[in-house]
C-alpha cells in the first residue's frame, strides 16, 4: 500500500498543483490509514472493506479526533481509493458507502474597522522592515489574499498603473485582485525605495523580503501579525487569516455582491464565502440586543 500512497501523492502534487502544506496533510492522514491497516494485518488494498474503514474511523474518534478531522480524513482516503481504482491498483472502492459526518463550521474571528486601523498603524514607517510590514498588512486587508499567496508574489505580478495584483491560489489557480489607492501608494514606495535596501546581494523577484534579503516565509508573516496585534492591544486571536476574514466581512457588511467577494477570495464553493454573511448576521443580532428597547 505504501507504493500506491506515494504514487497518489505524486499525482495530486503534479496534476492538482496542491501546496506543500496540503500535500503534507494528505500524507499524514494516509500514513495513519496505512499504519492502522498494518496493525490489522491487511496486506493488500483490496482486502480493505467498509467495516474495516468504519473501525479505523472509530479508532480515530477514540483518540479524540474532532468531527472536522474525521471529515477531512474520509475525504483523503476516499480520494486515495478513487485514484487506486482508476489507475487499476485496486479492483474496488470501499469508501463508496462511507458517509462524511456533518460538523458545524466555526465562525472566524473578525476585527472591526477601528481594530484594523489600530493594527495597520502599528509598524514603524521610519524603518525598512516597518515600512515593509505596513505594506504587507495593507495588502492583506485590501485584497483578502491568503498568506501563502502573498509570499509567492513577484514584482511582475503587481501592476500599479492598472491597479491590480495577480496571485496563484489553491490548485495553482490564477486570479486578479483589484488594488485600492492606499495600498497602491504603499506598494509604490516599498517597491521603488524600500525593497532595494532589503535586497542586498540576493537575486530574487519575490516581492517581500526579510532583513537578510531572502523571501519572507509563512511563519515570518504569522510572527509579525502576532507581534503587531500585541502592540496594538487587540484582545482577539490574530492569525494570518484574520485580515482575510475581516476583508470579506467588511465588504459584505457594506453591500458587496457575494459572487464578487467569492471571486476575490478565490473560493471554489460559494458556501465558504457565505460563512462571512453569518458573521455579519451575528453582529447585527448583537447590535439589536444591545440597542432595541424590546430586545
UniProtKB/Swiss-Prot annotation:
TM regions (residue ranges): none
GO terms of molecular function: DNA binding; tyrosine-based site-specific recombinase activity
Domain (Tyr recombinase): residue spans on this chain: 106-289
CC per GO annotation: cytoplasm
Presence of keyword Cell cycle: yes
GO BP, one annotated term: chromosome segregation
SUPFAM superfamilies given in the database record: DNA breaking-rejoining enzymes
Subcellular location(s) of the protein: Cytoplasm
Pfam (any one): Phage_integrase
CDD domains: INT_XerDC_C (cd00798)
Domain Core-binding (CB) as annotated: residue spans: 1-85
Domain of life: Bacteria
Main subcellular localisation: cytoplasm
Family according to the record: Belongs to the 'phage' integrase family. XerD subfamily.
Function: Site-specific tyrosine recombinase, which acts by catalyzing the cutting and rejoining of the recombining DNA molecules. The XerC-XerD complex is essential to convert dimers of the bacterial chromosome into monomers to permit their segregation at cell division. It also contributes to the segregational stability of plasmids.
NCBIfam families, alphabetized: PRK00283.1, recomb_XerA_Arch, recomb_XerD
Subunit-level organization: Forms a cyclic heterotetrameric complex composed of two molecules of XerC and two molecules of XerD.
Entry protein name: Tyrosine recombinase XerD
Species this protein is from: Staphylococcus haemolyticus (strain JCSC1435)
Amino acid at each position: 500500500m505504501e507504493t500506491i500512497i506515494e504514487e497518489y501523492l505524486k499525482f495530486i502534487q503534479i496534476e492538482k498543483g496542491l501546496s506543500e502544506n496540503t500535500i503534507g496533510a494528505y500524507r499524514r492522514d494516509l500514513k495513519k490509514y496505512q499504519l492502522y491497516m498494518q496493525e490489522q494485518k491487511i496486506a493488500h488494498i483490496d482486502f480493505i472493506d467498509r467495516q474495516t474503514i468504519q473501525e479505523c474511523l472509530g479508532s480515530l474518534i477514540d483518540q479524540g479526533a474532532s468531527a472536522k478531522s474525521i471529515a477531512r480524513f474520509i475525504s483523503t482516503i476516499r480520494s486515495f481509493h478513487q485514484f487506486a481504482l482508476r489507475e487499476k491498483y485496486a479492483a474496488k472502492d470501499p469508501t463508496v458507502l462511507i458517509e462524511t459526518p456533518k460538523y458545524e463550521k466555526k465562525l472566524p474571528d473578525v476585527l472591526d474597522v477601528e481594530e484594523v486601523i489600530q493594527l495597520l498603524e502599528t509598524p514603524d514607517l521610519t524603518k525598512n522592515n516597518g515600512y515593509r510590514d505596513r505594506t504587507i498588512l495593507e495588502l492583506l486587508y485590501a485584497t483578502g489574499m491568503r498568506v501563502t499567496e502573498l509570499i509567492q508574489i513577484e514584482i511582475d505580478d503587481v501592476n500599479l498603473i492598472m491597479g491590480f495584483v495577480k496571485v496563484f491560489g489553491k490548485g495553482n489557480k490564477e486570479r486578479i485582485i483589484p488594488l485600492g489607492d492606499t495600498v497602491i501608494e504603499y506598494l509604490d514606495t516599498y517597491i521603488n525605495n524600500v525593497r532595494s535596501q532589503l535586497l542586498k546581494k540576493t537575486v530574487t523577484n519575490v516581492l517581500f523580503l526579510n532583513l537578510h534579503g531572502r523571501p519572507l516565509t509563512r511563519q515570518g508573516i504569522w510572527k509579525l501579525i502576532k507581534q503587531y496585534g500585541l502592540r496594538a492591544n487587540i484582545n482577539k486571536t490574530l492569525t494570518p487569516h484574520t485580515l482575510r476574514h475581516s476583508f470579506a466581512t467588511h465588504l459584505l457588511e457594506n453591500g458587496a455582491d457575494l459572487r464578487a467577494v467569492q471571486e476575490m477570495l478565490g473560493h471554489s464553493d460559494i458556501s465558504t464565502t457565505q460563512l462571512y454573511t453569518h458573521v455579519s448576521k451575528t453582529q447585527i443580532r448583537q447590535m439589536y440586543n444591545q440597542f432595541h428597547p424590546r430586545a
